[in-house]
């Protein structure tokens, strides 16, 4: 089921009343179905449920693997908020769910938030400008704003090119790994003509303590024989990767539907041609005329 798109402006507004009717659910068990999740949410007038998945293409075959996340739309924004308040932290299939209001990814809104964080008011001199110290008359350059980081998600850089979520889940097994996103990104160095692609991943762990312990303990270890980099993930990167994964899934579903329609049309055309090639049955008059 494809949920309707919420209003981004309303979802990003700072009003006390929630505007979006959609919620975001993570840490789902990979075997959870949309029917089970809808049953889990039915008390709050759920309208539609979507559990994204991705197609992993191998040399001989392809497998469909859920992303461990889900989206749900409700009859009203109040129902969505009640679902978050009552079900966040509850268990489904022995997995503790993380549920929050859905906020659409918006590069423009993120840029505006960064711009606001960098704004630092210039120091104002007192009523007598001559008596103000020299340092107070010269505005100080704003300190670079640190981008907020996640409290439970680790950013893994410079991973082996063939790594999958299976190896990462085993690598972080002692720290309750949950959502795992593996992706390829472009790397570059300023003032040097050097570009390369490297493999990175975002791994959501059990909590803040697990994140700190994993970085401290695993930061010096090798994964598949390669030294990697671990640090807390930026919240903007987490949102970007999650929405990119969801968008990729939507495109794959559209392509699959297009292929199915084309295959059906081709089959119908072949059937029509075969029917046209079958000779018509002879009537008694035709038999008599032949005799």
Curated annotation (Swiss-Prot):
Region (Disordered): 109-151, 271-291
Gene3D superfamilies, sorted: 3.30.70.330
Keywords: Repeat, RNA-binding, Transcription, Transcription regulation
Pfam families in UniProt: RRM_1
Keyword Transport: no
GO terms, molecular function: mRNA binding
PANTHER family per UniProt: OS02G0815200 PROTEIN, RRM DOMAIN-CONTAINING PROTEIN
Function of the protein: May be involved in the modulation of rDNA transcription.
Similarity field: Belongs to the RRT5 family.
Name of the protein in question: Regulator of rDNA transcription protein 5
Native source organism of the sequence: Lachancea thermotolerans (strain ATCC 56472 / CBS 6340 / NRRL Y-8284) (Yeast)
Taxonomic placement: Eukaryota, Fungi, Dikarya, Ascomycota, Saccharomycotina
């Amino acid at each position: 089921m494809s949920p309707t798109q919420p209003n981004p402006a309303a979802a990003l507004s700072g009003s006390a009343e929630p505007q979006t009717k959609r919620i975001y659910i993570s840490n789902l068990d990979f075997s959870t179905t949309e029917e089970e999740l809808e049953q889990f949410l039915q008390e709050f007038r759920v309208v539609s449920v979507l559990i994204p998945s991705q197609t992993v293409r191998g040399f001989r075959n392809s497998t469909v693997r859920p992303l461990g996340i889900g989206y749900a739309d409700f009859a009203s924004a109040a129902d969505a908020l009640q679902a978050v308040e009552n079900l966040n932290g509850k268990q489904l299939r022995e997995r503790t769910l993380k549920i929050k209001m859905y906020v659409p990814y918006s590069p423009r809104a993120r840029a505006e938030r960064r711009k606001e964080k960098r704004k630092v008011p210039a120091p104002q001199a007192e009523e007598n400008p001559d008596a103000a110290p020299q340092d107070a008359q010269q505005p100080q350059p704003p300190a670079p704003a640190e981008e907020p980081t996640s409290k439970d998600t680790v950013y893994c850089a410079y991973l082996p090119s063939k790594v999958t979520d299976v190896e990462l889940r085993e690598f972080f097994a002692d720290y309750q790994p949950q959502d795992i996103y593996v992706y390829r990104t472009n790397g570059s160095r300023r003032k040097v003509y050097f570009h390369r692609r490297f493999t990175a991943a975002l791994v959501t762990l059990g909590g803040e303590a697990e994140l700190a312990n994993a970085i401290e303990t695993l930061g010096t270890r090798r994964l598949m024989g390669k030294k990697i980099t671990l640090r807390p993930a930026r919240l903007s990167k987490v949102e970007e990767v999650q929405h990119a994964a969801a968008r990729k899934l939507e495109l794959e579903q559209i392509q699959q539907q297009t292929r199915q329609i084309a295959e059906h049309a081709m089959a119908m055309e072949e059937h029509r041609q075969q029917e046209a090639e079958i000779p018509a049955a002879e009537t008694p008059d035709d038999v008599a005329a032949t005799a």
